[in-house]
Amino acid sequence: MAKEKPHVNIVFIGHVDHGKSTTIGRLLFDTANIPENIIKKFEEMGEKGKSFKFAWVMDRLKEERERGITIDVAHTKFETPHRYITIIDAPGHRDFVKNMITGASQADAAVLVVAATDGVMPQTKEHAFLARTLGINHIIVAINKMDMVNYDQKVFEKVKAQVEKLLKMLGYKDFPVIPISAWEGDNVVKKSDKMPWYKGPTLIEALDQIPEPPKPIDKPLRIPIQDVYSIKGVGTVPVGRVETGVLRVGDVVIFEPASTIFHKPIQGEVKSIEMHHEPLQEAYPGDNIGFNVRGVGKNDIKRGDVAGHTTNPPTVVRPKDTFKAQIIVLNHPTAITVGYTPVLHAHTTQVAVRFEQLLAKLDPRTGNIVEENPQFIKTGDSAIVILRPTKAMVIEPVKEIPQMGRFAIRDMGQTVAAGMVISIQKAE
């Protein structure tokens, strides 16, 4: 049997109006992956005589977006010769940051779209910092709107230099920079004849070369629980995605912070595992599974609990403990000071956390400390802080289990900051 093509999740990032949606639209249009409902609408309008025009499709997508129906560009799939690619999200969705962190899908790579007409803009920087903070290691740069600068190589080189400077400061190496026109279809799927000076890959060729994401099977087992069902004749069935490690029938698993909160181990032997209604003997990272655990009741566990092996249980941070984190403030109306208590979202959990200390303000580009013990931090700042959860929760240092160490901080219906756990300080 031929090995299945690797699945890769990508996000599109970049400044507003630089052409992210158009680029996604063009990728889907030229690979014949436009959502069914749009094609249907086209046919219903009796426009069979006209060629299926890109501009028309983009207008429909835009209309539906404005009516508040996101054509879920999110979770749109297409194939390249060597990859199955899922576009998991694009900013502009209000919950973009939260989705990137707590979403069922961690991005393997990002496409940074920069308009040749503008170059690097504030959001270009913010999204690039964010990609770094969220552990996206592979980036592809698309310099869009080349048609608006007459496909001029000099303009391309100038913008390319700006982007390279930004990304290299953030520690990115070896990334393709591709001149495209999403609107005209140059170098997205089809090679352009308008830029003979460019010898590199098209966008789809670059996507086809994204490294296969490694499966973290050597890390300790962690399964954040999304839901808990009670199934007649089976019993309690927690459902979640295996983030790290391997779960096998017969393993003994423990749930945290449930065990800490109930002051008794909520644990048992795994009797069965199912994925898409098929029984499995073992489940690997990325698998969305339901599993039945002997002796664990429906009221013992809930969304936000995490399953791990009893030999290496999930790390619990209690209200008497604290953790040190590096954050980037994305959107706060005034300033964050000690005592601020927003809600932290990580994997499937959400818990209010208190800012206990502001240890240092960092230069977001270099990571160097620019100020010790600042009085406050504001939008655009990167900082090292000490946080204390208001109730027990599972979170892991990002160096040990990166999948379980990233978080979003939300308040007033928006994402205020994104961050990662550096270390955990347990109270005696």
Curated annotation (Swiss-Prot):
Binding residues annotated for GTP, in chain numbering: 14-21, 89-93, 144-147
Annotated region (G1), positions in chain: 14-21
GO CC list: cytoplasm
Database matches in PROSITE patterns: G_TR_1 (PS00301), G_TR_2 (PS51722)
Annotated region (G3), positions in chain: 89-92
Binding-site positions, Mg(2+): S21
Compartments reported by the entry: Cytoplasm
CDD domains listed in its UniProt record: EF1_alpha, EF1_alpha_II, EF1_alpha_III
E.C. number: 3.6.5.3
Keyword Iron-sulfur included in the entry's annotation: no
Keyword check for Transport: no
Region (G5) location: 181-183
HAMAP family per the UniProt record, alphabetical: EF_Tu_A
NCBIfam families with a match to the protein in the record: EF-1_alpha, PRK12317.1, small_GTP
The protein's role, per its UniProt record: GTP hydrolase that promotes the GTP-dependent binding of aminoacyl-tRNA to the A-site of ribosomes during protein biosynthesis.
Protein name listed in UniProt: Elongation factor 1-alpha
Source species: Thermococcus gammatolerans (strain DSM 15229 / JCM 11827 / EJ3)
Gene: tuf
